[in-house]
Amino acid sequence: MFRKGKKRHSSSSSQSSEISTKSKSVDSSLGGLSRSSTVASLDTDSTKSSGQSNNNSDTCAEFRIKYVGAIEKLKLSEGKSLEGPLDLINYIDVAQQDGKLPFVPLEEEFIMGVSKYGIKVSTSDQYDVLHRHALYLIIRMVCYDDGLGSGKSLLALKTTDANNQEYSLWVYQCNSLEQAQAICKVLSTAFDSVLTSEKP
């Protein structure tokens, strides 16, 4: 199931062009950041839908990832300042340098399931759930090269609580930028599916 899900969603050319276009617009504002060519982001605050219908909206795409760490319960003022993808990347970089987040993830691999309901991160046997991120609580997703020269990419999620009082950052490591972008594409499709179904 894992391979099918990954193969099916990674072949979506229309979503790929949307992600890469957004990536280029981010690159132009990066200045001298060495990772500029590998940044892609998904801003879920936007209510713009691509208008594509997804017949498999109930399916769940699964990806093997590793968990780096999280910064939970950020104050409202702190979280609001983390609007753009660069804000998130810089914040995570500083947190890693300050020891609040590790540079290297745990050895254990987890399964990240992405569907129209959100994201579920569970153990590889899928008996234990590590995290659940409801779709409506995900504010932004950013993927970028980890900068360690290993070819791995980081996937960062910015979420809020049900009352919009606190923000949290969740950081996962992907095997490649392609895998990280595939996760962004699936999540983008999930948002489009929900937005399309809500239209009268």
From Swiss-Prot:
Biased composition annotated in UniProt, kind: Low complexity: 11-29
Domain PID: 58-200
Modification after translation: Phosphorylation at Thr-38 seems to enhance integrin alpha5beta1-mediated cell adhesion. The degree of phosphorylation is regulated by integrin-dependent cell-matrix interaction.
GO molecular function, one term: integrin binding
Keyword Amino-acid biosynthesis carried by entry: no
Location of this chain's protein in the cell: Nucleus; Cytoplasm; Cytoplasm, Cytoskeleton; Cell membrane
Stretches with biased composition (Polar residues): 34-56
InterPro entries: Integrin-bd_ICAP-1 (IPR019517), PTB/PI_dom (IPR006020)
Phosphoserine: residues bearing it: 41
Modified residues (Phosphothreonine): 38
Membrane-spanning intervals of the chain: none
SMART domains for the chain: PTB
Spans annotated as Interaction with KRIT1: 136-139
Sequence motif: Nuclear localization signal, positions: 6-7
UniProt feature, compositional bias: Basic residues: 1-10
Annotated stretches, region: Interaction with ITGB1: 139-141
GO cellular component: cell periphery; cytoplasm; cytoskeleton; cytosol; lamellipodium; nucleus; perinuclear region of cytoplasm; plasma membrane
Keyword terms: Angiogenesis, Biomineralization, Cell adhesion, Cell membrane, Cell projection, Cytoplasm, Cytoskeleton, Differentiation, Membrane, Mitogen, Notch signaling pathway, Nucleus, Phosphoprotein, Transcription, Transcription regulation
Annotated region described as Disordered, given as residue ranges: 1-56
One of the protein's GO biological processes: positive regulation of transcription by RNA polymerase II
Quaternary structure (record): Interacts (via N-terminus and PTB domain) with ROCK1. Found in a complex, at least composed of ITGB1BP1, KRIT1 and RAP1A. Interacts (via C-terminal region) with ITGB1 (via C-terminal cytoplasmic tail); the interaction prevents talin TLN1 binding to ITGB1 and KRIT1 and ITGB1 compete for the same binding site. Interacts with KRIT1 (via N-terminal NPXY motif); the interaction induces the opening conformation of KRIT1 and KRIT1 and ITGB1 compete for the same binding site. Isoform 2 does not interact with ITGB1.
The protein's role, per its UniProt record: Key regulator of the integrin-mediated cell-matrix interaction signaling by binding to the ITGB1 cytoplasmic tail and preventing the activation of integrin alpha-5/beta-1 (heterodimer of ITGA5 and ITGB1) by talin or FERMT1. Plays a role in cell proliferation, differentiation, spreading, adhesion and migration in the context of mineralization and bone development and angiogenesis. Stimulates cellular proliferation in a fibronectin-dependent manner.
Protein name, per record: Integrin beta-1-binding protein 1
